[in-house]
Amino acid sequence: MELQEYELITVLGPTASGKTAFATRLANELNSEIISADSRQVYRNMTIGTGKDLDNYIIEGKFIPYHLIDICQAGEKYNVFRFQHDFHEIFTKIKKKGKLPILCGGTGLYIESVLKGYKLLDVPENLILRSNLKDKSVDELKKILKSYKNLHNQTDTDSVRKIIRAIEIETCYPTQKNNPINSYSSIKSLIIGVNIDRELRRNRISLRLKKRLEEGMIEEVKNLLETELSPDQLIYYGLEYKYITLYLIGQLSYSEMYQQLEIAIHQYAKRQMTWFRGMERRGFKIHWIDVYEMNHLNEIFNRIHF
């Protein structure tokens, strides 16, 4: 199969793997555009904590067009249903330009939903269900969620609010047949996964966390608390926003925040890899490249053997 026979190139990998830098180099080589598959980078004013690293989108002075970054206000509801719709809108526009779009990100559910063309319901909030579940622990809620068989984002269940939303979605499927449904075809995509040694990944995560704190990540969260969002809303976004918020409202010391956040990011990267390995078991062919190969595009394509 030749490269032009694909409808899409997908670049995936865990956090701190360098997948965005690789995708932008690829886009520059192919005169392409990037569609982000990151569930948090859609939000404006959440730049440092989500690792947008927009400098990556400039290669040798050339701007690489990107999409689905900074499209929502912080606090606005965004989910896989909306992502599917937004992706296909951008995907179609890029294809009409005669370009091969590149999907890049680490949110496995978002990636899988568009590649397989999952039919998804637009699920409303269930206030009664939320009230019944709000006092349960994370472990109790995870047990409830695991009792369902439908697809849900197990890489992103690190807060009570997120798990309740996942349960809300699962309970809606058998009963809300008349809700709007996204119905899209599956997409023939070349999938490239960036594989990074576990110890190197851990070192990168630790160094990156230190760098982001030095760049003003705490100030970013503080500004969001002062101007836009409540603590509960920020905690919902998890990881950096969760732990820094807990620090700012006095529930954690700086040292506790730093240690717990670092551990949580390592755990998140591990869950991402678990999701990607699950994709392989579900029939996706992922061509894994080593992080050290990323500058050698021709060698990568020759090895993949289209």
Swiss-Prot record:
Region called Interaction with substrate tRNA, residue ranges: 38-41
- Which keywords does UniProt give here? ATP-binding, Magnesium, Nucleotide-binding, Transferase, tRNA processing
- All disulfide bonds of the chain are none
Its cofactor is: Mg(2+)
Any one Pfam family here would be IPPT
Question: Where is substrate bound in this sequence?
Answer: T15, A16, S17, G18, K19, T20
Please list the GO biological process terms of this entry. tRNA modification
Q: Does the keyword Magnesium apply?
A: yes
Reactions listed under catalytic activity: adenosine(37) in tRNA + dimethylallyl diphosphate = N(6)-dimethylallyladenosine(37) in tRNA + diphosphate
Q: Where is this site: Interaction with substrate tRNA?
A: T107
- What SUPFAM superfamilies would the database entry show? P-loop containing nucleoside triphosphate hydrolases
Recorded superkingdom: Bacteria
Q: Which residues form the signal peptide?
A: none
Whether Nucleotide-binding counts among this entry's keywords is yes
**Catalytic activity, EC:** 2.5.1.75
Under the heading InterPro entries, the entry gives: Dimethylallyltransferase (IPR039657), IPT (IPR018022), P-loop_NTPase (IPR027417)
Q: Which GO terms describe its molecular function?
A: ATP binding; tRNA dimethylallyltransferase activity
Q: Which residues bind ATP?
A: G13, P14, T15, A16, S17, G18, K19, T20
Subunit field text: Monomer.
HAMAP family, per this entry? IPP_trans
Q: Which family does it belong to?
A: Belongs to the IPP transferase family.
Q: What does this protein do?
A: Catalyzes the transfer of a dimethylallyl group onto the adenine at position 37 in tRNAs that read codons beginning with uridine, leading to the formation of N6-(dimethylallyl)adenosine (i(6)A).
Q: What is this protein called?
A: tRNA dimethylallyltransferase 1
Question: Which species is this UniProt entry from?
Answer: Azobacteroides pseudotrichonymphae genomovar. CFP2
